[in-house]
Amino acid sequence: MTRQMILAVGQQGPIARAETREQVVVRLLDMLTKAASRGANFIVFPELALTTFFPRWHFTDEAELDSFYETEMPGPVVRPLFEKAAELGIGFNLGYAELVVEGGVKRRFNTSILVDKSGKIVGKYRKIHLPGHKEYEAYRPFQHLEKRYFEPGDLGFPVYDVDAAKMGMFICNDRRWPEAWRVMGLRGAEIICGGYNTPTHNPPVPQHDHLTSFHHLLSMQAGSYQNGAWSAAAGKVGMEENCMLLGHSCIVAPTGEIVALTTTLEDEVITAAVDLDRCRELREHIFNFKQHRQPQHYGLIAEL
């Protein structure tokens, strides 16, 4: 018997710096409801989905910086999203900035959670591959200070049972790193999902700008194919505070084929019928890890 589900991606248009969380949650609720009306069992939302992409600014006021982080999840403003998910019977993946205090010390993470159809958090991931830089760089038209505002994740690349599927998460830059995909593939992930905020202009290497979409889709397609997993990527897209963000949110089959792709630079929902048993086609006949992998030759990957 095949295990079928409808997978959705909820792409976000720009979020202005002045836009409130309440306004953003209304938009997320609208996409959640649209996905459920199309029969979706699960929807993927973007990285840092509750605010504008604040690492593009250099903050000197710690209180102002803290205002972009969540200290509890769900908090009062975000709780309606969890309640609506439980009402409609649809799970979701949500990215946000997380602030925790341990031993009197503030710790900040770029975080993503998995929520099941009952509205319960069943998984958490903290972004490991942080891009960008740590200090202000005057030549840039916008900053990319993730290394300043977050520490690398400390949870590894876990895989969780979410309703009927085994799911793993990436956040933005993680999707470019094959090690992330392979760890989740080895752990049996059937769906690998996450969000991104990807500028179409990269100031250090502007000669790559025309390849931004190509590299994004290449990473998603190769990751899915080489690990025999479905994947889904949800972008925050369009012109956000004078920074153009990449579109092309997508759903990819274990064969590497794109089965759904957004066509706008605004809030948009895409869906695809997903047969989880198709993962076996790749894992049994092409990438049979137990039969073909030779890990004794891979040590350099972790040593350097």
UniProtKB/Swiss-Prot annotation:
EC numbers for this chain: 3.5.1.77
CN hydrolase domain segment(s): 5-276
Cleaved signal peptide residues: none
Gene3D superfamilies registered for this protein in UniProt: Carbon-nitrogen hydrolase
Keywords recorded for this protein, A-Z: Hydrolase
Catalytic activity: an N-carbamoyl-D-amino acid + H2O + 2 H(+) = a D-alpha-amino acid + NH4(+) + CO2
Sections of the chain in a coiled coil: none
Active site: E47, K127, C172
Superkingdom, taxonomy of origin: Bacteria
SUPFAM superfamilies assigned: Carbon-nitrogen hydrolase (SSF56317)
InterPro entries: Aliph_Amidase/BUP, C-N_Hydrolase, C-N_Hydrolase_sf
Primary role: The enzyme catalyzes the hydrolysis of N-carbamoyl-D-amino acids to the corresponding which are useful intermediates in the preparation of beta-lactam antibiotics. Industrial production of beta-lactam antibiotics is now being developed using this enzyme.
Name recorded for this polypeptide: N-carbamoyl-D-amino acid hydrolase
